[in-house]
């Protein structure tokens, strides 16, 4: 991304440098005189789109956005060479905000199209000469297009990062008790193995035993595990091991005389041991691979830390909009925290935070989410 931003900085700088100073001054004049009207007209048109209105219906937000749009128009159309780097950073910041609250890129692109459409009559109704109007329009449109390209590219990057964080949170929430889940599944596959070994050794028969894919572990892996760990190489290895052993198992079930032969029986049991051993090793590696997602947990309070708050808020806002239900966020500030640390020491302060988080979590209903907002604040949604 750094190389891309450098290239766009050079292009934007070139546009400003090559433009006639008089034309730049007239573009800035248009922006200062008409930014307020353009922002009002912009949101009037954009809000006609039902999808866009989801993000713009709140009156307070709309007022903030209108003033922000005014500033954006003035900044972009009044750009000097020394402003370019700052303007690129502004586009990046706006894109990050759009990605964080889930505004689709197509709405952003529609907004730019609307802006260029309503800018045209404003420029051509001015008292400039025909040649000046054309040059001002070209400079303004090119400036907006560069800003749009930077914002869109930054949005795509931020949206991709946000999507990865959403996926990380999904895995984290599913595997919050990863160690317990790992041991449960290892115990499950070992129980299946022991059951078969006993039947083979005592009866030389598999009886009503199930193939691995239909046993408890196999069902968990195929219906949950594969989804939890999607994209990790070990998943494919475990799938092949299950599939290969099911073939051996089904062949043995069809020809039970195999187990009456001592050497074939020993071979079958060794195949079971080898398969289960490999699966357990790979399963441990899978859980170790996702254990890095535990950085999403605050070490002290064992609550979700700020890393996942944007993901959680985005999800909760979307749910509230979809269902038409109110959404509240409670910020709990642990008072006199510095005084406690200074008087009684950090260990006492840490213990108080642990106690507050424990009691808060204990009193919350299951559907509520408690997270650590900062060193002394808890957030509830």
UniProtKB/Swiss-Prot annotation:
Site feature: Critical for restricting water access to the heme distal side to avoid rapid autoxidation: 65
GO terms of biological process kind: cell adhesion involved in single-species biofilm formation; negative regulation of bacterial-type flagellum-dependent cell motility
Site label Involved in oxygen binding and important for the stability of the Fe(II)-O(2) complex, positions: 43
Domain GGDEF per the UniProt entry, residue ranges? 325-381
GO CC term, one of those recorded:
plasma membrane
Q: Where does substrate bind?
A: 341, 350
Q: Identify the residues that bind heme.
A: 98
Q: Where is the signal peptide?
A: none
What reaction does this catalyse?
Answer: 2 GTP = 3',3'-c-di-GMP + 2 diphosphate
Which GO terms fall under molecular function for this chain's record? Answer: diguanylate cyclase activity; GTP binding; heme binding; metal ion binding; oxygen binding
Q: Hey, where's the site called Transition state stabilizer on this chain?
A: 338
> What does this protein's record comment on cofactor binding?
Binds 1 heme group per subunit. Binds 1 Mg(2+) ion per subunit.
Provide the cofactor list for this protein: heme; Mg(2+)
User: What is the annotated role of this protein in its UniProt record?
Assistant: Globin-coupled heme-based oxygen sensor protein displaying diguanylate cyclase (DGC) activity in response to oxygen availability. Thus, catalyzes the synthesis of cyclic diguanylate (c-di-GMP) via the condensation of 2 GTP molecules. Cyclic-di-GMP is a second messenger which controls cell surface-associated traits in bacteria.
Provide the protein name: Diguanylate cyclase DosC
The organism that produces this protein has a lineage beginning with:
Bacteria, Pseudomonadati, Pseudomonadota, Gammaproteobacteria, Enterobacterales
């Amino acid at each position: 991304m750094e190389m891309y931003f450098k290239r766009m900085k050079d292009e934007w700088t070139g546009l400003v440098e090559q433009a006639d100073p008089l034309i730049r001054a007239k573009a800035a004049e248009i922006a200062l005189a008409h930014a307020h009207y353009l922002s009002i007209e912009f949101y009037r048109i954009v809000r006609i789109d039902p999808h866009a209105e989801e993000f713009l219906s709140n009156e307070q937000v709309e007022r903030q956005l209108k003033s922000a749009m005014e500033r954006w128009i003035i900044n972009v159309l009044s750009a000097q060479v020394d402003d370019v780097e700052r303007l690129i950073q502004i586009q990046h910041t706006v894109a990050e905000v759009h990605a964080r609250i889930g505004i689709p890129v197509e709405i952003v692109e529609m907004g730019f199209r609307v802006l260029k459409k309503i800018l045209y009559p404003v420029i051509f109704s001015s008292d400039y000469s025909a040649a000046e109007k054309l040059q001002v329009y070209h400079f303004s449109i090119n400036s907006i297009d560069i800003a749009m390209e930077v914002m869109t590219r930054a949005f795509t990057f931020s949206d991709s990062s946000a999507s990865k964080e959403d996926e990380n949170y999904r895995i984290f929430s599913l595997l919050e008790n990863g160690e317990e889940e790992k041991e449960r599944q290892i115990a499950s596959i070992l129980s299946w193995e022991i059951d078969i070994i006993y039947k083979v050794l005592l009866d030389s028969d598999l009886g009503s035993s199930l193939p691995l894919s239909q046993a408890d572990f196999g069902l968990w892996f195929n219906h949950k595990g594969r989804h939890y760990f999607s994209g990790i190489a070990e998943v494919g290895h475990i799938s092949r091991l299950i599939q290969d052993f099911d073939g051996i198992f089904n062949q043995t079930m069809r020809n039970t005389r195999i187990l009456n032969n001592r050497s074939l029986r020993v071979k079958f049991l060794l195949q079971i041991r080898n398969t289960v051993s490999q699966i357990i090793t790979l399963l441990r590696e899978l859980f170790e691979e996702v254990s890095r997602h535990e950085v999403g947990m605050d070490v002290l309070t064992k609550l979700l830390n700020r890393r996942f708050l944007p993901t959680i808020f985005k999800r909760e806002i979307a749910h509230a909009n979809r269902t038409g239900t109110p959404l509240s966020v409670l910020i709990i500030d642990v008072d006199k925290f510095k005084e406690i640390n200074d008087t009684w020491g950090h260990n006492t302060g840490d213990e108080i935070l642990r106690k507050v988080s424990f009691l808060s979590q204990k009193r919350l209903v299951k559907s509520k989410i408690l997270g650590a907002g900062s060193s002394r604040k808890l957030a509830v949604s």
